[in-house]
């Protein structure tokens, strides 16, 4: 009702169009009240911001109004079992198949995994530079909310029993 899911989404896409400073202050205040809720909205904000900054006009028109309304929730997956926080060491890849890409690999965590309907997945491609710090692309993968095999080849494990952040799936 407050429109918080659209905090940084431009008004033309149904959002509030607020600044990064306002975003930081909002997340700080939400975390002060309940850390898990800040994790839920912050991950959504990150995906919305990536789309706003780097998405095509078609992607923005398709995703941002639904994200601003809270109808579509964003999730982000980057870490992999073998590399921890060393993002350059990821091995998941996207291989071009005609006009499409096929994503292959395993991720360690998927914040908002069960509740999200669009996932930003960081993978390597074979296009461009030979540097391990380049050729990384974020793909948007639509999925139904829920756990288990939600799409062929995409399994969202159940909630992890964590010490903190218990409200974040």
Regions found by a protein language model. Give the residues of each.
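Internal helix-loop-helix
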Residues: 2-71, 112-118
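Short beta-turn/strand-loop junction motif enriched in small, turn-promoting residues
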Residues: 12-14, 79-83, 106-109, 124-128, ...
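Flexible, glycine-rich active-site loops centered on histidine and acidic residues
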Residues: 48-54, 76-77, 88, 128
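A short, Trp-centered hydrophobic/proline-enriched beta-strand micro-motif
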Residues: 70-78, 122
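Active-site-adjacent elements of ketosynthase-type condensing enzymes
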Residues: 82-90
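A structural signal for short hydrophobic beta-strand segments in well-ordered beta-sheet cores
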Residues: 92-95
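A short core secondary-structure module
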Residues: 100, 104-153
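Flexible, small-/acidic-enriched active-site or ligand-binding loops
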Residues: 147-169
């Amino acid at each position: 009702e407050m429109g918080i899911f659209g905090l940084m989404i431009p008004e033309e896409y149904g959002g509030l169009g607020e600044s990064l400073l306002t975003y930081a202050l909002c997340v700080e205040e939400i975390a002060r009240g309940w850390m898990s809720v800040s994790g839920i909205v912050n991950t959504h904000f990150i995906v919305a911001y990536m789309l706003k900054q780097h998405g095509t006009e078609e992607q923005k028109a398709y995703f941002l109004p639904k994200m601003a309304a809270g109808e579509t929730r964003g999730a982000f997956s980057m870490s992999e079992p073998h590399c921890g926080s060393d993002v350059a060491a990821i091995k998941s890849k996207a291989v071009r198949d005609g006009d499409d890409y096929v994503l292959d690999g395993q991720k360690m965590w998927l914040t908002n995994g069960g509740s999200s309907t669009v996932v930003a997945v960081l993978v390597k491609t074979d296009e461009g530079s030979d540097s391990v710090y380049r050729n990384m692309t974020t793909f948007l993968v639509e999925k139904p909310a829920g756990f288990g095999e939600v799409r062929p080849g995409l399994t969202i494990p159940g909630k992890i029993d964590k010490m903190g952040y218990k409200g974040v799936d």
